[in-house]
């Protein structure tokens, strides 16, 4: 079968890559074309557009890059039209993906499956109307979403487990439990440049009182999650401006 996937950020890229591997296990002849990232590309298929070119958030950033986003939408529709996949699989990223779902559904091109459902319980609950009209099957990685969709909105949804739990288990199997060498704070500033720029400096200022320079090893260790598509220089520059002791901070990919 031919699968067209769309993931618009680093987490979606990671989860979509695992989904592609699972599909290959049951459909060895599967072929993929996708909007995604490095993780999906490592599995195989054809990367049509990297998510870093479309990962904008907030009114101002979206407005500034609107021509790029609209070009991405037009190209995505054209690629689906010309390739004629057997299924379109949307991974999170609802602002873009629901527009694609609408197009594919109205053109009756193929079934539309949504993996990692839009977080309409948090905001933009009105998106349930688009989901109901244009999505054939919805898959959730958060168990409480089942009650939300089925009891509140009477829309069927399937809980398929949380891939992040699998990632944690795999990491601990490879690296073992963290060493008890003091306290650790994980900072997760996001995967988009704007998120990182806006969030990380504030996070570092919040933890700075715990990392003041003193004798011996610091009691608190700061671990910053580095997004796959972002250069490390972006993080180191923000850390330096924050004035934290270098030995207290570690970038983790």
Where are the predicted features?
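Charged active-site motifs of nucleotide-sugar-dependent glycosyltransferases
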Residues: 2, 180-186, 221
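Active-site and donor-binding regions of nucleotide-sugar-utilizing enzymes
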Residues: 3-176, 187-199, 209, 229, ...
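A general structural motif
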Residues: 29, 109, 182, 217-219
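Short hydrophobic signal-anchor/transmembrane segments that target glycosyltransferases
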Residues: 198-217
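Flexible, glycine/charged-enriched surface loops at secondary-structure junctions
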Residues: 216-221, 248-249
């Amino acid at each position: 079968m031919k699968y067209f996937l769309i993931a618009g950020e680093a987490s979606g890229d990671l989860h979509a890559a695992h989904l592609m591997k699972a599909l290959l296990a049951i459909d060895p002849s599967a072929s993929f074309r996708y909007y995604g990232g490095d993780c999906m590309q490592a599995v195989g298929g054809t990367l049509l557009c990297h998510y870093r070119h479309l990962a904008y958030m907030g009114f101002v950033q979206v407005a500034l890059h609107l021509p790029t986003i609209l070009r991405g939408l037009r190209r995505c529709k054209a690629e689906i039209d010309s390739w004629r996949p057997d299924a379109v699989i949307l991974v999170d990223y609802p602002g873009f993906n629901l527009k694609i779902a609408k197009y594919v559904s109205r053109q009756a091109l193929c079934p539309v499956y949504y993996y990692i459902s839009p977080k309409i319980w948090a905001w933009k609950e009105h998106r349930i109307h688009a989901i109901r009209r244009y999505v054939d099957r919805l898959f959730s990685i958060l168990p409480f979403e089942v009650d939300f969709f089925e009891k509140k909105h009477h829309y069927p949804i399937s809980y398929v487990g949380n891939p992040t739990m699998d990632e944690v288990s795999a990491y601990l199997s490879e690296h073992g439990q963290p060493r008890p060498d003091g306290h650790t704070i994980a900072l997760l500033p996001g995967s988009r440049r704007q998120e990182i720029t806006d969030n990380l400096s504030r996070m570092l200022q919040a933890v700075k009182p715990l990392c003041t320079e003193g004798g011996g090893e610091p009691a608190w260790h700061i671990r910053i999650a580095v997004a796959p598509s972002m250069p490390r220089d972006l993080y180191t520059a923000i850390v330096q401006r924050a004035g934290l002791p270098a030995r207290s901070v570690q970038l983790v990919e």
